[in-house]
């Protein structure tokens, strides 16, 4: 009902996305989250569609709360979709035909329990400029995240070695 009310025509649901050039996975396979050691991120876009003007839009269903991090998540998905549309146009034809650039993102909160008189959903709109901006922020934070991960793994390996030596 929300899609119809917004004038959105779905073209794909549950699309696995990833930073393709760094990922060791089959774009359509179930192992889309099996990552190369240097991969930055992977995830699943809940929905991709076209608005009434033919612009590409994406959305993410949320059964919990709507948080600021969800906006950055949509921006990461938007960047990954754009990359996939450029590198795999035959697999992502409907997306590639729109240049693979989402113009709008939606966080759609669906209540876990519904009662009479309650709004069936709450929606936060993420405009194109914010998707672009947050995509840049996300990409800037990836090296920090990767460094933290490497430090934790090295510390874990040191503790295991000390335990086995001790």
Residue spans for each PLM region:
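Activation of the activation-loop gatekeeper triad in protein kinase-fold domains
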Residues: 61-62
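Metal-dependent nuclease catalytic regions and adjoining charged, substrate-binding loops involved
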Residues: 22-23, 81-166
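Short amphipathic alpha-helical face segments that pack within enzyme cores
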Residues: 46, 72-80
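A short pocket-lining beta-strand/turn micro-motif at the edge of beta-sheets
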Residues: 55-57, 73, 101-106
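Terminal helix/beta-alpha structural elements that buttress the NAD(P)+-binding lobe
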Residues: 65
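Catalytic cores of nuclease domains that cleave nucleic-acid phosphodiester backbones
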Residues: 1-57, 68-69, 84, 132
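Surface-exposed beta-strand edges and their flanking turn/coil or helix-capping segments
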Residues: 26-28, 71-74, 120-122
């Amino acid at each position: 009902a929300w899609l119809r009310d917004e004038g959105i025509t779905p073209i794909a649901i549950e699309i696995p996305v990833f930073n393709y050039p760094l990922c060791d996975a089959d774009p359509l396979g179930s192992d889309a989250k099996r990552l190369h050691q240097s991969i930055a991120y992977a995830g699943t876009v809940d929905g991709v569609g076209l608005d009434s003007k033919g612009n590409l839009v994406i959305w993410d269903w949320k059964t919990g709360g709507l948080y600021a991090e969800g906006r950055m998540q949509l921006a990461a998905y938007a960047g990954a979709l754009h990359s996939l549309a450029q590198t795999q146009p035959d697999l992502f034809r409907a997306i590639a035909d729109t240049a693979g650039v989402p113009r709008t993102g939606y966080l759609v909160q669906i209540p876990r329990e519904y009662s009479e008189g309650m709004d069936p959903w709450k929606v936060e709109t993420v405009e194109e400029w914010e998707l672009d901006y947050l995509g840049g922020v996300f990409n800037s934070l990836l090296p920090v995240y990767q460094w933290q991960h490497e430090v934790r793994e090295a510390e874990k390996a040191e503790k295991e070695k000390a335990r086995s030596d001790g």
